[in-house]
């Protein structure tokens, strides 16, 4: 696996839907075969994955929103790498 580049534009793969699930009290990814429960960090990242923002814009927005989190850039890139490897997102 390799980290997504900062100019990549992530988007959810076809067939996946991101939403808050009250019954689970967390954000989830729904897809035809099931559901992925997401932790708070993953939910915050995927809120910004809209097929228009590049990775650099997502990182900048989250760094501004959570300035107290050390290493947030690397954490975001690592999550996007995993999400891509799991086929949750595509990178353009």
From Swiss-Prot:
Pathway: Cofactor biosynthesis; pyrroloquinoline quinone biosynthesis
Organism domain of life: Bacteria
The entry's keywords: PQQ biosynthesis
MF annotations from Gene Ontology: quinone binding
One Pfam entry name: PqqD
One BP annotation, GO: pyrroloquinoline quinone biosynthetic process
Summary of subunit composition and partner proteins: Monomer. Interacts with PqqE.
Protein role: Functions as a PqqA binding protein and presents PqqA to PqqE, in the pyrroloquinoline quinone (PQQ) biosynthetic pathway.
Family per record: Belongs to the PqqD family.
NCBIfam families: PQQ_PqqD, PRK02079.1
Protein name (Swiss-Prot/TrEMBL): PqqA binding protein
Organism: Pseudomonas aeruginosa (strain ATCC 15692 / DSM 22644 / CIP 104116 / JCM 14847 / LMG 12228 / 1C / PRS 101 / PAO1)
Gene coding for it: pqqD
């Amino acid at each position: 696996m390799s980290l997504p580049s900062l100019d990549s534009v992530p988007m959810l793969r076809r067939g996946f839907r991101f939403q808050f699930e009250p019954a689970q009290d967390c954000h989830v990814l729904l897809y035809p075969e099931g559901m992925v429960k997401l932790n708070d960090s993953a939910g915050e990242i995927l809120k910004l994955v809209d097929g228009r923002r590049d990775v650099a814009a997502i990182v900048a927005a989250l760094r501004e929103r959570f300035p107290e989190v050390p290493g947030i850039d690397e954490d975001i890139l690592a999550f996007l790498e995993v999400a891509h490897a799991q086929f949750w997102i595509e990178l353009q």
